[in-house]
Structure formats: structure tokens, C-alpha cells
């Protein structure tokens, strides 16, 4: 069981899962919250709500694809309060699979995660005390198997899922916990644009509650809801001829 998660940094905190997580940590004893997002008004609103719950909260509009800016931001706040949890949550959907959108998806969903996780890991390695040192990465159920409705999105999430799983094992000896989150369809600005069916759709606060409990228990892979997790896992182990047949009958647009 993880204890003393007092200083928390969350990217993509101005909506969806990130916003809901910020509120949960503010309501459950976090002393310092450092939040980033792309929308000033929404970010200011969530900062104010977290402060009402008693957490000292600072927000910053920052582009996670900016490596130098992310390093500076993370180091700056670690000096103010030794970080216990760094949550690489920011991500985008692809929309139409144009070259521009494809590159943007990988830059944000993959490089954005690396730009968040890498400086945090280096800071954690230098810390020799017993305080909590946690990395959390938001991947997706779509990362279990490439979905025809979103090739770039699925591939980007598969990349960070595999990265997180490997990182968890490689950092175990350093007493650094790594949790990989693979949610299904959760209310966010991304799913608000979806026109395809979204089975087992979940509100952000419910999803955040599952994630919070999973991190507290240090569960390596927090994937939900379980019917979707089982379904995509099953598809991933089927022979290609069968999985191709099934996918040919699924929606080709998200």
C-alpha cells in the first residue's frame, strides 16, 4: 500500500481523467498539486477547486512535447516540494488519419510521456529517502491491440503501455513504482467528439476513483472496465485470420 503521497504532478489536468484525479488527490490529503493543461480557463477552474479542498495548487499551461520546458517545470516544482507522484496523463486523439494528425498524435502521446517521465525518474533516482516515488502513465485499452478505428492512437498507446511495463520492472530495485493505466471509454474532450458506439462508457470521476485505488495498492496494470479488458486481450491472442474477421465488422471511425 502506497503511503504519504503528498506532492503530486499531473499533466492533462484541465479535463477528463486528469481533472478528476486532481480533485481526488486534493480531497485525500495531497499537500501540493502541480497541474498542467492546454486551456487556461479550465485549468484555473480546477486549480481553484483543488485549493478549496485544502491542497496548495499551482497550474501551468505547458506543451508536453516541449522537452526543455517540461524538464524545467518538473525540476522547479520538485525543488518546492519533493514529488511523490508524477502522472503522465496528457494525450490526444488522432481524428482523421492525416499525416499532420498522425505525427501530432505520436509527438503528444509518446514523446509527451517521455518528456514527463524521464526527468521525474532522474530526480527520483537521486533521492535516497523512503518517501513515495511513483510514476503513473495513462495508456489505453486501445493499446492492447491495434484498432482499425484509430491506428495512430492505438499504436501510440501500445508504445507507452509497453514502455511503462518494462520501466516498472527496471526501476523496481530503485524503489520507484510505475503504474500503467489502460482505461476504456471515459468522458473527456476526446470521447465527446466520438461518433462511434462506446460500450461500457464511464464518467471521469468513477474512472479516477478506480485509478486512485489502483495506485494506492501499487497495481502494475490498471485496466478497466474488465469486459473490455478481457475482450481486447482475447483479440490480441487470436490468430490473425480470426481477429481480422472480427475487426472487419467493427466501426472504422472514432
Residue ranges with predicted function:
Residues 14-15:
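Conserved glycine-rich cofactor-binding loop
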Residues 30-46:
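Conserved glycine-rich Rossmann-like NAD(P)H-binding loop of the short-chain dehydrogenase/reductase
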Residues 96-107:
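Short alpha-helical oligomerization interface
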Residues 117, 156:
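Active-site helix of classical SDR
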Residues 140:
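Residue(s) in the substrate-gating loop at a strand-loop-helix junction
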Amino acid at each position: 500500500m502506497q503511503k504519504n503521497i503528498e506532492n503530486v504532478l499531473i499533466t492533462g489536468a484541465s479535463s477528463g481523467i486528469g481533472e478528476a484525479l486532481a480533485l481526488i488527490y486534493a480531497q485525500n490529503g495531497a499537500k501540493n498539486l502541480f497541474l498542467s493543461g492546454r486551456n487556461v480557463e479550465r485549468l484555473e477552474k480546477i486549480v481553484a477547486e483543488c485549493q478549496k479542498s485544502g491542497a496548495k495548487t499551482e497550474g501551468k499551461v505547458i506543451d508536453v512535447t516541449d522537452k526543455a520546458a517540461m524538464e524545467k517545470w518538473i525540476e522547479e516544482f520538485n525543488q518546492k516540494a519533493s514529488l511523490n507522484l508524477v502522472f503522465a496523463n496528457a494525450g490526444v486523439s488522432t481524428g482523421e488519419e492525416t499525416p499532420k494528425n498522425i505525427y501530432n498524435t505520436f509527438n503528444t502521446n509518446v514523446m509527451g510521456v517521455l518528456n514527463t517521465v524521464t526527468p521525474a525518474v532522474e530526480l527520483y533516482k537521486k533521492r535516497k529517502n523512503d518517501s513515495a516515488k511513483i510514476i503513473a502513465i495513462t495508456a489505453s485499452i486501445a493499446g492492447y491491440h491495434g484498432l482499425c478505428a484509430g491506428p495512430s492512437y492505438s499504436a501510440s498507446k501500445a508504445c507507452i503501455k509497453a514502455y511503462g511495463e518494462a520501466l516498472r520492472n527496471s526501476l523496481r530495485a530503485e524503489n520507484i513504482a510505475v503504474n500503467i493505466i489502460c482505461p476504456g471509454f471515459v468522458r473527456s474532450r476526446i470521447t465527446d467528439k466520438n461518433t462511434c458506439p462506446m460500450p461500457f462508457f464511464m464518467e471521469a470521476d468513477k474512472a479516477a476513483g478506480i485509478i486512485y485505488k489502483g495506485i494506492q495498492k501499487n497495481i502494475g496494470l490498471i485496466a478497466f472496465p474488465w469486459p473490455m479488458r478481457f475482450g481486447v486481450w482475447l483479440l490480441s491472442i487470436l490468430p490473425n485470420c480470426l481477429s481480422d474477421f472480427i475487426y472487419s465488422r467493427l466501426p472504422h471511425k472514432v
